C-alpha cells in the first residue's frame, strides 16, 4: 500500500499547512451546512501540496460527493451529463447537500475535453450544491473565465519543517531507521511537495536498511517544475542539455509543451536554417507522440521530449540575449484542430467503408451528398443509426441537433420494426417446424363398433307399443315364479 494513501488526512484539521486557507474553507462549509449557499471554491497551487486531499477531507462533512479528475474524459457533453445533472438534483440521502469536485480544471485540453471549461461555467450558474474546483497554475488561461465565478484560494507550498515532522512520524510508525539529517534534507529537497516527499521516502526505505544523508543527496528533485513558461524559455535560451531536460519536467501535457515551443521558435530564432532544423525536431517529436497514442506504449514520450527539448535547443548556433515574450499557441492550436478534423473525417470514412463496402476515397467523396441528405431530420437519424455515427460525427454534416421528437418517433418505429421482424421470424420458424411433422395414417373403424351402432339405431326405431308389450310380459312372468316356490315349500 502506498504511504500517501495510508497517511492521507481524513479531516480538515489533519491537513498539513495552509492554516489560513483551511479556516476560510471551514467557514465556507459551515455556511453551506447552515443553508446559506456560497460561490464555488477554486483551490489553486502547485502539485502535491494537498489540494485534492483537502477537498476529499471536506467531502466527509457532506452526505455524498462526486469527483471528476484528469483521468476522466471531460468534454462538454460528459461534464453536463455527470456533474451537470448532479449539480441541480437532490442528494440520495434526502435534502442534504452533496459536494462536487472537479480536479485539475486547468488541465482540460485536447479534442476529448473540448468545451469542458465552458460547460463548467454554465453549471456554476445553475448549481444548487457546493462545488470545489482544483487547479495547478493560477495564471493558466483555461481558468481565467472561472476565477470570476469562484472564491479563489491560492494554496502555498508546505513548509519543509512540517514535511520533516510528518516524515519522522511515518518512520516511527513503519519502523524505519533513518538519519534525522537525511529526513531533513529530503523535506528540503521536496520543494514543498508533500506527496513527492512521502513517495520518495517509501522508495528509499524499500532499498536501504538505514536511510542515510548520502542516499538523499543522490536523488533528483523536482525544483523549477512550476510553470510551462520556464520550460519553454530554457529550451529557447539555453544550449545545456541537462538544463533543458530538467526545465521540461513540468506538470503539463507534453504535447501542449511541444505546441508552446513550436509557437515561439520564430519569435526567438532569427536564422532560417535554425528555424528549419528546430521544426524538423518538432516534427519528429510529434511523430513519436503519435506512435505513443496509437500503440499505447508511452515509452515513446522520452524520445519525443528529447527531440522537442534538446533537439530544438541544439538547433541554434548560439544563444540570443534579446528578451522574448513567450506566448500561448495560436497557429499550432489551429493546426491541432485541423488534425482533429482529419481524424474525424477518417473515422466517418472508416465506418462508411465497413458498412457500404466501399473505399475511403469513395466514402469521402460522398460527404457533400450526405450534407444535403442530413438536412432532413428523419433521414439524418436513419443514416446515423445505420452507420453508427456518434454526436461529433453527426455534427460534421449538420450544425443543428436532431430534434428529440424526431429521435423518439424514429426509435419507436425502429422498435416496432424489430417486433414485426421478430414475429415474422417466429412464424417462419413455426412453419418450418410444422413442416417436419410426418403425415398421419387413417385409422380404420372396428366392425363391432358398426354393429353396435346398427343395434342402437334399431332400438331407436322401436315403437312405444313394443316397449310396453315387453314390459307387460315381464310383469306376468314374475308371479308365476313366485307360486312355484310356494308349492314346493308346502310339499316339503
Curated annotation (Swiss-Prot):
Report the domain of life of the source organism. Answer: Archaea
Q: Where is this region: Disordered?
A: 429-450, 462-492
Q: Which residues bind ATP?
A: 45-52
Basic and acidic residues biased stretches: 470-479
Gene3D superfamilies, per database record:
1.10.8.60, P-loop containing nucleotide triphosphate hydrolases
Cite the entry's keywords alphabetically. ATP-binding, DNA replication, Nucleotide-binding
| A Pfam family | AAA
UniProt record, GO biological process:
DNA replication
InterPro entries xref list = AAA+_ATPase, ATPase_AAA_core, P-loop_NTPase, Rep_factor-C_lsu, RFC_lid
Question: Which GO MF terms are attached to this record?
Answer: ATP binding; ATP hydrolysis activity; DNA clamp loader activity
Q: Subunit composition?
A: Heteromultimer composed of small subunits (RfcS) and large subunits (RfcL).
- NCBIfam families per the UniProt record, alphabetical: PRK04195.1-5, PRK04195.2-3
The record's comment on protein family reads:
Belongs to the activator 1 small subunits family. RfcL subfamily.
Function as written in the Swiss-Prot or TrEMBL entry: Part of the RFC clamp loader complex which loads the PCNA sliding clamp onto DNA.
Protein's recorded name: Replication factor C large subunit
Q: Which organism is it from?
A: Methanobrevibacter smithii (strain ATCC 35061 / DSM 861 / OCM 144 / PS)
Amino acid at each position: 500500500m502506498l504511504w500517501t494513501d495510508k497517511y492521507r488526512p481524513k479531516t480538515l484539521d489533519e491537513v498539513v499547512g495552509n492554516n489560513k486557507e483551511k479556516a476560510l474553507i471551514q467557514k465556507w462549509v459551515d455556511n453551506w451546512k447552515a443553508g446559506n449557499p456560497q460561490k464555488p471554491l477554486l483551490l489553486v497551487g502547485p502539485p502535491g501540496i494537498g489540494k485534492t486531499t483537502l477537498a476529499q477531507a471536506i467531502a466527509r462533512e457532506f452526505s455524498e460527493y462526486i469527483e471528476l479528475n484528469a483521468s476522466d474524459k471531460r468534454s462538454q457533453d460528459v461534464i453536463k451529463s455527470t456533474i451537470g445533472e448532479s449539480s441541480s438534483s437532490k442528494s440520495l440521502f434526502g435534502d442534504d447537500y452533496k459536494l462536487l469536485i472537479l480536479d485539475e480544471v486547468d488541465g482540460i485540453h485536447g479534442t476529448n475535453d473540448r468545451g469542458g471549461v465552458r460547460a463548467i461555467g454554465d453549471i456554476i450558474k445553475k448549481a444548487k450544491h457546493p462545488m470545489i474546483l482544483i487547479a495547478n497554475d493560477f495564471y493558466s488561461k483555461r481558468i481565467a473565465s472561472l476565477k470570476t465565478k469562484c472564491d479563489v484560494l491560492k494554496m502555498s507550498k508546505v513548509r519543509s519543517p512540517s514535511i520533516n515532522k510528518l516524515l519522522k512520524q511515518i518512520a516511527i510508525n513503519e519502523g524505519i531507521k533513518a538519519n534525522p539529517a537525511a529526513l531533513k534534507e529530503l523535506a528540503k529537497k521536496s520543494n514543498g511537495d508533500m506527496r513527492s516527499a512521502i513517495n520518495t521516502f517509501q522508495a528509499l526505505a524499500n532499498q536501504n536498511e538505514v536511510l542515510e544523508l548520502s542516499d538523499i543527496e543522490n536523488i533528483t528533485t523536482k525544483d523549477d517544475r512550476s510553470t510551462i513558461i520556464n520550460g519553454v524559455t530554457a529550451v529557447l535560451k539555453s544550449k545545456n542539455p541537462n538544463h533543458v531536460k530538467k526545465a521540461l519536467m513540468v506538470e503539463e501535457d507534453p504535447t501542449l509543451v511541444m505546441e508552446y515551443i513550436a509557437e515561439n521558435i520564430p519569435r526567438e530564432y532569427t536564422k532560417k536554417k535554425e528555424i528549419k532544423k528546430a521544426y524538423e525536431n518538432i516534427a519528429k517529436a510529434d511523430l513519436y507522440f503519435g506512435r505513443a497514442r496509437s500503440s499505447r506504449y508511452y515509452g515513446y514520450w522520452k524520445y519525443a521530449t528529447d527531440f522537442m527539448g534538446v533537439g530544438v535547443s541544439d538547433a541554434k548556433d548560439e544563444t540570443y540575449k534579446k528578451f522574448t515574450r513567450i506566448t500561448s499557441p495560436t497557429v499550432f492550436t489551429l493546426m491541432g484542430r485541423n488534425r482533429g478534423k482529419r481524424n474525424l473525417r477518417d473515422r466517418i470514412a472508416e465506418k462508411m467503408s465497413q458498412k457500404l463496402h466501399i473505399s475511403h476515397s469513395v466514402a469521402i467523396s460522398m460527404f457533400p451528398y450526405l450534407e444535403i441528405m442530413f438536412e432532413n431530420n428523419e433521414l439524418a437519424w436513419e443514416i446515423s443509426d445505420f452507420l453508427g455515427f456518434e454526436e461529433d460525427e453527426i455534427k460534421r454534416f449538420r450544425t443543428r441537433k436532431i430534434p428529440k421528437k424526431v429521435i423518439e418517433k424514429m426509435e419507436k418505429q425502429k422498435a416496432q420494426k424489430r417486433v414485426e421482424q421478430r414475429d415474422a421470424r417466429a412464424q417462419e420458424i413455426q412453419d418450418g417446424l410444422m413442416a417436419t411433422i410426418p403425415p398421419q395414417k387413417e385409422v380404420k373403424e372396428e366392425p363391432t363398433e358398426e354393429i353396435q351402432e346398427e343395434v342402437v339405431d334399431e332400438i331407436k326405431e322401436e315403437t312405444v307399443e313394443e316397449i310396453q308389450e315387453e314390459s307387460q310380459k315381464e310383469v306376468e312372468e314374475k308371479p308365476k315364479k313366485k307360486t312355484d316356490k310356494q308349492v314346493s315349500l308346502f310339499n316339503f
